[in-house]
Amino acid sequence: VNEGEPTSVRRRSETRRRLLAAAAALFESTGTISQRVEDICGRAGFTRGAFYSNFTGVDQLYLALHEEQAARVWERLRHALDAQLAEESRADTLEDAVGFLLDSLPDSREWFSLRSVLLARAAADPAFAARMTLDDGHVGRELGDRFVALAAVHHRVPVVAAAVLAKAVVAAHVGAVSQSPVDVSGALTQRLTVAAVIRGLTVEAAAPTRT
């Protein structure tokens, strides 16, 4: 067993973490992913060699940052959905359930801003778009069944596939959040938009047939 391996793994992990943190800080201050490797390395306190031992380029770095931030959002959303599926903690109405879900999310404006920039890049770069598509497909599979179950709790049945419902909800929320800088009622807009999408893609469940 190579006793030095755990230390090198920890060192590599710390290098990656600091590079991601530097990229996040630069994006927050500039609003763009068009950063130079030298600027990211200078912010993180590393050489170009350390950068390229972790990432093939700036695009891969920002995709990794997006995935890391998204993972935190999805994890909180999964837990919030599970809470709404539990009888002892569920809300009385679909709108209240949506409010609970959105209130449970971390302050993720930076992620939504980064996602918007990455989507704009994806529109002009098919290869870049393919990498983001894989990420979104995973989200749909993870969350789809939970959104179907949430609809069922409120006596509604989806008219689309579970993954499509989940993607539509995420798209609606991302779109509403993107308006936050110019929307003084941003939280209400997000709640109404997400609830409207769920209602629009579901119908009332049929009443049980009496025998």
Named regions from a protein language model:
Residues 129-133, 150-211:
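Hydrophobic/aromatic-rich alpha-helical bundle segments in the mid-to-C-terminal region
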Residues 74, 106-116, 126-152:
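Amphipathic alpha-helical packing segments from all-alpha helical-bundle domains
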Residues 11-23, 40, 65-69, 73, ...:
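Generic hydrophobic, amphipathic alpha-helix propensity
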Residues 1-14, 206-211:
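N-terminal intrinsically disordered/low-complexity leader segments
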Residues 57, 121-126:
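Short loop-to-helix capping motifs
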Residues 60, 64, 77-112, 162-169:
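Hydrophobic alpha-helical connector segments
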Residues 18, 25-64:
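Helix-turn-helix
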Residues 20, 95, 137-148, 166, ...:
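An amphipathic alpha-helix signature
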